[in-house]
Amino acid sequence: MRTTRRQAFIARTRLAAAAVNATVDLHIAPDVVIGRDVRVTFDPRSRNVLQIGPQSRLEDRVLVQLKGGTIRIGDRVQIRRDCVLNVAGELTVEGDSPISWGSIIHCSTRIHLERMVGLAEQVTLADSSHFFTEPDAHFWHNVRTGSIEIGRNTWLCPKVTVTRDVKIGSHCIIGAGSVVVGEVPTGSLASGVPATFRPLPLPW
């Protein structure tokens, strides 16, 4: 009986965890589609969770980096080519979501995408940032974190960046190239650097 790509992915993932004395609670629905060169890496001795729900898809060259984190991907989620999920916290994608080519998610604490959230090409979500303290102290060692929440049926256009401590409501559109640094109310169109918002003329 031929080994499917999904079965090979599960075996490789378990071996990658064992190689660095990490653990992974792994649940991959039977009909999940795994592309070519999809990789999962683990921090040594970390404890991790990876769940992928029914009818979801990880396309070619997706990289998942688990650093003692939890990833819960619901049903009918498409993670397209060359995306990166770098997770030390808790990442939840509820379902019915496209995450398009080259998008990057850095999750240190908590990132939650409600159903039907869409990320276009090269979107970045990062719930942490670095800062300076003194001239000879490396900025990389100083980290601030804060969760990201994105509401139902919200669309992030290409090359949007969402920073820490951000809540975006439902039925929003975030314009291409925008940087979101604060709260965006439900039913808003937001754009710019930093993004400002105005009401979206919704048909209801």
What are these regions (language model features)?
Residues 1-65:
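Extended, small-residue-rich solenoid/repeat segments and analogous flexible loops
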Residues 8-11, 16-22, 29, 88, ...:
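A sequence-composition feature that detects small, non-aromatic residues
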Residues 15-19, 114, 169, 180-181:
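Short, solvent-exposed secondary-structure boundary motifs
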Residues 31, 147, 187:
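A residue-level signal for beta-strand positions that form part of recognition/binding surfaces
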Residues 38-166, 193-204:
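Flexible, glycine/small-residue-enriched loop-and-beta-strand segment within the central core
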Residues 167-191, 195:
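C-terminal/domain-terminus segments
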